[in-house]
């Protein structure tokens, strides 16, 4: 028995560890360090219909417990991803999750329709929560009706299950999650980065050229845990949890909150081996905690509460 096997819509994962979109590129750099086939899946970098060069520099800044980024969805565009990046990834035993982005609804639909045809793309991640672009991105993810409409339109053209990436920069994330579920989403990924800023002590001006950026890393983990905990009790579709994961213990905490798999982001920049290390350490941690299979951890924090009432 594979104690780490996870079954999700469109995704049969040998383990629940997935490098997060935007922190792993298309895997080429990390393939120099280890065989990517050990991973559960890869969420590839956000893909738009046309190439994007991203925001002006500087667009990354360190913060205590994390980092700010304002990359701006830099990517080579749909044609290059379809004809170069995805074919290259076929050498690995991996179901790919393609992250889809755009400036308007029609862009999302066009990219989703084409990229979902790729033989190794088993699911889409609808990026409606990027805080670092002026159009699209987070504009779609802060309004339940708009988020639901976009989800429905993408579902109509996609040949694979659709997961929607939620923004934490909202007043009521549960309301948005439920609207997206009603619109037909197959799953959720959460959370994207928190909007933040740093100022230069000498100039008193923002360090990032974009002024603001997305905060990621361990600093946001408690927020992510709280939101996964809330949303998982309100919806009946699976959640891929993310936000500050660095260790096997972090993974179990997300599972306890209600996640069915996890994505590791910023930690990949610090330690390129973080994902295989977590995968290697999980079985011993399950033994220590008394679990036969990782699925036994899912939702344990609130399911225990329900059973005790």
Curated annotation (Swiss-Prot):
A GO BP term here is:
'de novo' UMP biosynthetic process
InterPro entries per UniProt: Aldolase_TIM, DHO_dehydrogenase, DHOD_1B, Dihydroorotate_DH_1, Dihydroorotate_DH_1_2, Dihydroorotate_DH_cat, Dihydroorotate_DH_CS, Dihydroorotate_DH_I
Reaction equations catalysed = (S)-dihydroorotate + NAD(+) = orotate + NADH + H(+)
| Catalytic residue list | 130 (nucleophile)
What positions does the entry give for FMN binding? 21, 45-46, 99, 127, 165, 191, 217, 243-244, 265-266
Presence of keyword tRNA-binding: no
Q: Give the Gene Ontology MF terms in alphabetical order.
A: dihydroorotate dehydrogenase (NAD+) activity
Q: What EC number is given for this enzyme?
A: 1.3.1.14
* Pathway the protein takes part in: Pyrimidine metabolism; UMP biosynthesis via de novo pathway; orotate from (S)-dihydroorotate (NAD(+) route): step 1/1
Checking Pfam families in the record gives: DHO_dh
Keyword Transit peptide included in the entry's annotation? no
Principal subcellular localization: cytoplasm
**Protein location:** Cytoplasm
- Provide this UniProt record's keywords sorted from A to Z: Cytoplasm, Flavoprotein, FMN, NAD, Oxidoreductase, Pyrimidine biosynthesis
Quaternary structure (record): Heterotetramer of 2 PyrK and 2 PyrD type B subunits.
Q: Which family does it belong to?
A: Belongs to the dihydroorotate dehydrogenase family. Type 1 subfamily.
Q: What does this protein do?
A: Catalyzes the conversion of dihydroorotate to orotate with NAD(+) as electron acceptor.
Identify this protein by name.
Dihydroorotate dehydrogenase B (NAD(+)), catalytic subunit
Q: Which organism is it from?
A: Bacillus cereus (strain B4264)
Q: What is the lineage of its organism?
A: Bacteria, Bacillati, Bacillota, Bacilli, Bacillales
